[in-house]
Regions:
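N-terminal presequence-like segments and the immediate start of the first folded domain
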Residues: 1-62, 66-80, 85-199, 205-253
Length: 253
């Protein structure tokens, strides 16, 4: 997923304290910057910042801007993000604060409810940014102000988390997986990619009782030479949603 890679550069904004935990705030390889999960933290004092989700997200985005700037990038270069919320009730407030940071081409995104490392944290955000030309991929539906269906950056495609919840799939994890993958397939095709180009997937499940049904549908979709994958238990923000799937694809030269 890295063009022009081979290097591994730690990105650390000037004047910031080192994280007390064993990670770097960001790593740059070639044209791609991988940011660690950011929480509301005073990076000079290494202390948590209290406040509601909007206040905490503001701190996260200001810190994110510093990291991006240190790598010669900005929010326009962010191609993919994952948002983790401690409380589902914060979803709307988070979205309002989040979209203020991005213009008409927000990154691909998945948002789930998850336990965070500290009870003082309400939200955590990870991001991937890529230098150079990028384009949002449209599948013809109504634009979502919070995310793009996918972002293409060179030979890579970052696809948002897709759900398969609908009246006809309610309560059926296998059917929802098939529908989510069909929507992913439509997005891949719109960008000039195919399912054979998918290199990694992330599956969120609301209940691991659905693991077998999800796996059966997932296996049938890809057939063979499966992409790398992680499957995680998390809360989804569609009340009927059982499965959400996010993928990255790389097109062969």
């Amino acid at each position: 997923m890295v063009a022009g890679g081979g290097e591994r550069v730690v990105v650390h904004p000037e004047g910031w304290n080192r994280s007390p935990n064993p990670y770097s705030y960001a790593i740059r390889s070639g044209d791609t910057l991988f940011l660690s999960g950011l929480v509301a933290r005073d990076v000079h004092a290494n202390t948590a910042v209290q406040g509601d989700v909007a206040a905490q997200l503001d701190v996260i985005m200001r810190n994110g801007a510093d990291i991006l700037r240190a790598a010669g990038l900005g929010f326009d270069d962010v191609v993919s993000a994952k948002v983790f919320l401690a409380d589902a009730a914060d979803f709307s407030a988070m979205n309002a604060a989040y979209r203020a940071r991005f213009g008409s081409r927000p990154p691909a995104r998945a948002t789930v409810r998850a336990a965070l490392a500290s009870p003082s944290h309400t939200v955590e955000v990870t991001m991937v940014a890529v230098a150079g030309a990028k384009e949002a991929v449209s599948t013809g539906g109504r634009p979502n102000p919070n995310l793009s269906a996918a972002i293409r950056a060179g030979d890579r495609l970052y696809v948002s988390g897709m759900l398969g919840a609908a009246d006809q799939t309610r309560g059926d994890a296998g059917a929802q997986t098939r529908e989510a993958l069909a929507r992913i397939d439509t997005t891949l095709t719109a960008a000039g990619f195919s399912r054979a180009d998918v290199v990694e997937g992330l599956v969120y499940l609301t209940d691991f009782a659905h693991y077998g049904a999800m796996n059966d549908a997932y296996r049938a979709f890809f057939g063979k030479d499966f992409p790398a994958r992680a499957t995680v238990g998390a809360g989804l923000f569609n009340p009927d949603g059982l499965v959400e799937i996010m993928v990255t694809a790389v097109k062969a030269p």
